[in-house]
């Protein structure tokens, strides 16, 4: 199998338990780009992550096209996020145009992941205007940091599947 587009969100402790070392873990993640992504493929990379920059450099050296995503200067740049009890509003810039999207996703990391996925769709050939219009209809995945109820004290009750101790921290911080 050869992929046309692959995405890199981040390099964290989340799945480290499957690998003997961090180096082995990064080599496994990098394998998606150097063994499965085709030479003419698109690498969509979060460049706010230090390992994202390492991966970006490696993909460019192989001649793969790269689309960058992040808060720093990027092809798809996150300009701001505002949060409320129903989700977040994301302001971003892509191809010289600003887009504002309201989505029912709790937590900054979910907005960042959404934009990385959007970058993958753009790399696959979608038109930006149609894509950002479609993002407005995104729905949340139950169990992935959603707010199914409000307690009698008016405090929100959150449900989040966090498979490792390392994944509890960003979920907790998002609330």
Per-region residue spans from a language model:
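Acidic, Mg2+-coordinating active-site environments of NTP-dependent enzymes
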Residues: 2-156
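Active-site beta-alpha connecting loops in nucleotide-dependent enzymes
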Residues: 140-143, 160-175
């Amino acid at each position: 199998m050869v992929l046309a587009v692959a995405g890199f969100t981040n390099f964290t402790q989340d799945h480290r338990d499957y690998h003997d070392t961090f180096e082995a873990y990064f080599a496994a993640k990098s394998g998606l780009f150097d063994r499965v992504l085709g030479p003419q493929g698109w690498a969509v990379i979060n460049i706010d992550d230090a390992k994202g920059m390492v991966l970006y450099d490696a993909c460019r050296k192989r001649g793969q096209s790269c689309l960058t995503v992040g808060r720093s200067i990027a092809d798809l740049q996150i300009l701001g996020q505002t949060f409320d009890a129903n989700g977040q509003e994301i302001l971003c810039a892509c191809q010289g145009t600003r887009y504002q999207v309201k989505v029912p996703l709790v937590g900054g990391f979910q907005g960042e992941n959404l934009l990385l996925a959007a970058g993958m769709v753009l790399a696959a050939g979608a038109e930006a205007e149609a894509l950002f219009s479609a993002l407005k209809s995104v729905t949340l995945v139950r169990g992935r940091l959603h707010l199914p109820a409000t307690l009698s004290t008016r405090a929100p009750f959150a449900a989040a599947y966090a498979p490792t101790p390392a994944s509890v921290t960003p979920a907790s911080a998002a609330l």
